[in-house]
Structures are given as C-alpha cells and as structure tokens.
Swiss-Prot record:
An annotated GO cellular component: cytosol
InterPro entries noted in UniProt: Integrase-like_N, TACO1_YebC-like_2nd/3rd_dom, TACO1_YebC_N, Transcrip_reg_TACO1-like, Transcrip_reg_TACO1-like_dom3, YebC-like
Keyword Repeat attributed: no
Protein name, per record: Probable transcriptional regulatory protein HDEF_0869
Localization of this protein: Cytoplasm
Length: 254
C-alpha cells in the first residue's frame, strides 16, 4: 500500500489539533453517548463503545467524564435522537472527501458541511459519488522505536492485510474490520500499544497535491472539523515530504 505514514503526515497538524482539544472532547463525548445508547454500556459486548473509550483515553479524557457520557447514553434523554450521517464531496484538485457526522439536526449539519466545501473551492456531492474510492479498514499506527519484526509477526498472525514500515521507523497496520479486535488484543497483550487504533476509510488511489492545493485541503478539513457534528474526515489527498515540511513551517511561524 503506497503513501506516507499517517503518523508522519499529521505531525504538522498537532499544534492546531491541540488548540481544538475542547472540540475533540465534545465529539468524543457525543460518540460515547451514542455508542452506549445503541449497544449498551458494557464495552466487552459493544465494540463501538470500546473503540470510543480507547479514543477518549488516548486524548487524556478523565474516567469521570468518560463514565458520565456512557451513563447519559444508557439513560437516553437529550442525546437519544442522534443519527449517523455520511456526506461525500470533492476538494481541491478533485480530491475525494468523505465526512462522517453524528447529528441531532440534519439541516444544520448539511449546511455547515456544504459551507466548508464551498468556501474552499470544493463541492458537496451526492451519496455514492466518492465512497466507491474508499475501503473500510482497521488501521493501527505505531510511533518509531518499536521492534519492527515483532510487530509484523504478531500482526500477520492475527489477520493483518498489509503492513507499512516507514523510513523513520513508524509502522502502520491495515486489516479488515472483522480482525480489528483480534489484532488489537494480540499486540496489546505483547505490550505493543498503538498511537492510534481505529476503523477508517482507506482510499484505493491517492492524488498528489502541490503546496497550494495541500493548504486548501487542510483548510477544508479544519473548517469541517470546526463543526461539533463532524466526527471524522477522510480524503485521498497526498503530500510529499517537502510539502509536509513546508506546511509545518507555515503553521509554526510566530
């Protein structure tokens, strides 16, 4: 599977994401509430809730906040009419973009999503317009410094489809969704903790972007993620190492 490591490609976004910690917590709490409402409050029997809990803990959410969100989901109330909505569209240079939302007001959400596409020169498409370009996969990202042979051996034995080892030592593991929990448990039992572990949408092909289009795509992503309703944004844009470095420099200048 070609492309740059998600670990490497998102380094330049860390400062901006840290500034949005409050919004990230809002999104995670919404997912905790909804997953508990739909599948119950026991993570052992609710994979969606288990994934949401892992994400919450990876962002240093307190157990108290986490447990209150789950309790809200079990109890119903104001969050009981949340629905999952998936929007598809085109970003700069024809990049395919998928936007996963969790909303209690479809009209508000589509208005915010459409506005983000329009402001950055893209356009919101119809259902099915770009989803055929993506495949649902389990994705595990590991920071540099782990025993590569051990990670690869355990992952392949547990059902991994593909493994990428990058020049800096970062590792990405890809699997079909049904093997996600098995791989996660196997590697964690061996003491190998992923930086991120999630079910994601992986593009079958990528579009190389120049600096201008990369900046426009990141602006689109930032605008989408500013909406509390948007949970995840997937795209098939790709940046070279040089452009990633230029973006990092631009975002860190005083």
């Amino acid at each position: 599977m070609a492309g740059h490591s998600k670990w490497a490609n998102t380094k330049h976004r860390k400062a901006a994401q840290d500034a949005k910690k409050g919004k990230i917590f809002t999104k995670i709490i919404r997912e905790l509430v909804t997953s508990a409402r739909l599948g119950g409050g026991d993570p052992a029997s609710n994979p969606r809730l288990r994934t949401a809990i892992d994400k919450a803990l990876s962002h240093n959410m307190t157990r108290d906040t986490l447990n209150r969100a789950i309790a809200r989901g079990i109890g119903g109330g104001e969050d009981s009419h949340m629905e999952n909505i998936l929007y598809e569209g085109y970003g700069p240079a024809g990049t395919a973009v998928m936007v996963s939302c969790l909303s209690d007001n479809r009209n508000r959400t589509v208005s915010e999503v459409r506005h983000a596409f329009t402001k950055t020169g893209g356009n919101l498409g119809t259902g099915g317009s770009v989803s055929y370009l993506f495949t649902k996969k389990g994705v595990f990202s590991y920071a540099p410094g782990l025993n590569e042979d051990q990670v690869m051996e355990l992952a392949l034995e547990s059902g991994a489809d593909d493994i990428m080892v990058y020049d800096d030592g970062a590792i990405d593991i890809f699997s079909s969704p049904e093997f996600f929990e098995t791989i996660k448990k196997t590697l964690e039992t061996a003491g190998l903790m992923a930086s991120t572990a999630e079910i994601s949408m992986i593009p079958s092909t990528k579009i190389d972007l120049n600096l201008e289009n990369a900046q426009r795509l990141l602006r689109l992503i930032d605008m989408l993620e500013d909406s509390d309703d948007v949970q995840e944004v997937y795209h098939n844009g790709d940046f070279s190492d040089e452009i990633s470095a230029a973006l990092f420099f631009k975002n860190t200048k005083p």
